[in-house]
A protein has these predicted regions:
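Sec/Tat signal peptide C-region and signal peptidase I cleavage site
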Residues: 19-23
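Mature N-terminal segment immediately following signal peptide/propeptide cleavage
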Residues: 25-46
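Short catalytic helix/loop segments, enriched in acidic residues and glycine
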Residues: 49-69
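C-terminal accessory domains and tails appended to enzymatic cores
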Residues: 82, 219-288
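A glycine-rich helix N-cap at a beta->alpha junction
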Residues: 100-120
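Active-site glycine-rich loop that binds ribose-phosphate moieties when present
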Residues: 148-174, 183-186
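Active-site rim beta-loop-alpha module in soluble metabolic enzymes
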Residues: 170-178, 182-228
Length: 288
């Protein structure tokens, strides 16, 4: 009888020890969402995304709507944490009270080279772009530019990059893939050309300098579903990288003061090289 009791106790003890080992804890999945404004549904004029514009409040609300749709899609896909980076202008467009309370919001201008990607690190599993736009000079694009209206072209190692391109490179430094982007059709085509077949929603397209697009509600519905799909299939996404050293060529309409280490190639064109991508981006931010 004693022997049977000891055996039973041993089995109970084994079960207690084994239970935590067999119970699978959910893996942490952090999602980084960078949100710009020019690529939001309905936006067609720079006045609409300027703080002193009469319709800014309206499009600020649309920005929050598309942001929250992406946040919801991320959590539906299993995200355990979401960081939203306000990435437009002075980075003070999203009002904290308007953002899904499950997400953390990073707002305000950054002095660091990551800029629109401030906060990204290797603990994240996926990056999402909302409200993004094509690079300067892109035909058939809406409000196309590269960071400022002064930039004509920006290349790294010979690759001409939109904001989404160099932001994807920044994420790539930490091994994090961009899995989804929303913006106009030209933006979607441009990023897929650089990053491969990422999830995307083209919320509008250019027709004779006008914008033909989805209603905000439909855009938000498609973003929510698209982000969820993209994050669920993130294992297929490609981390975007270029091989160091990094050589940038920046063409501008009006020259700024030369950054330390930069060289003037000709009027309106400068170059800078470094094995450190963040150093290159710092030079770009100083001279753009």
């Amino acid at each position: 009888m004693l022997r049977h009791s000891i055996s039973a106790l041993a089995l109970v003890a084994l079960a207690i020890v084994a239970a935590p080992m067999s119970a699978q804890q959910p893996r942490a999945l952090k999602v980084f969402i960078s949100v710009d404004m020019e690529g939001l549904a309905g936006v067609v004029s720079g006045v609409e995304v300027s703080a002193n514009g009469p319709d800014y409040g309206h499009f600020r609300a649309i920005m929050a709507g598309e942001t929250n749709a992406a946040v919801e899609g991320a959590f539906r896909a299993g995200a355990t944490e979401v960081l939203v980076r306000d990435s437009h202008g002075d980075k003070r467009n999203l009002l904290p009270a308007d953002v899904d309370p499950r997400a953390r919001l990073l707002r305000g201008a950054s002095s660091g080279p990551k800029n629109m990607m401030e906060g990204i690190d290797s603990t994240f599993g996926a990056v999402v772009f909302i409200g993004y736009h094509a690079k300067a000079g892109t035909p058939g694009a809406i409000l196309e530019h590269t960071s400022t209206g002064n930039v004509v072209d920006f290349t790294i190692n010979g690759v001409s990059l939109p904001e989404g391109g160099y932001n994807a490179l920044t994420a790539g430094l930490y091994g994090v893939p961009v899995v989804f982007a929303a913006g106009d059709r030209a933006l979607v085509e441009q990023l897929r050309g650089l990053l491969g077949p990422i999830g995307a929603v083209a919320v509008k397209e250019e027709i004779g300098d006008a914008s033909l697009g989805m209603s905000p509600k439909r855009a938000q519905d498609e973003i929510r579903a698209g982000v969820e799909r993209a994050i669920r299939s993130r294992a297929k996404a490609r981390v975007y990288k270029l091989s160091p050293p990094y050589t940038m060529v920046l063409k501008v309409k009006q020259e700024r003061a030369l950054y330390a280490g930069a060289l003037k190639v000709r009027d309106g064109e400068v170059t800078f090289a470094s094995p450190d991508l963040l150093a290159v981006l710092a030079a770009f931010n100083a001279m753009k």
